[in-house]
Amino acid sequence: IIKNNQTISVFENISSGVISNSIKDFAKNNFNIGLTSGDKNISEFMKKYNFNISNKTPEQISIELAKFVRTLSSSDIGFAYYGITTGDENVQNLGQGESYFAIVDGTNNRTKHVRSAGIGIPDKRRAIMSSLSLIRNFLK
């Protein structure tokens, strides 16, 4: 990102900003914004900018969220993590649910689906690793 002089912004819904922090660590001043929000709030907010995530698959939602944060921040690259948890959310290593990752620029997008999601520390670590892997592969 720095080498290509590109900027990046991030949206995440269940990881409490840890993905944004990890990306900011390597992107430095090329990191624009990190946005964290729950489904209901972000859906209403996005409508004000003519983005709609209603009636879409989770993969489509992650792409729309990446496009949204890219547009909102005027970044070169938008990245989104959209996690859906199932089961007891108080468990530290939930490992259940679904994670959807998307990265977009002006012309390309790439997604990744992982059959694991949660709010515990191990879950967040898995989300960070999947995020960094997708970003690295996208930038190749």
What do these predicted regions represent?
Residues 1-140:
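Short alpha-helical segments enriched in small residues
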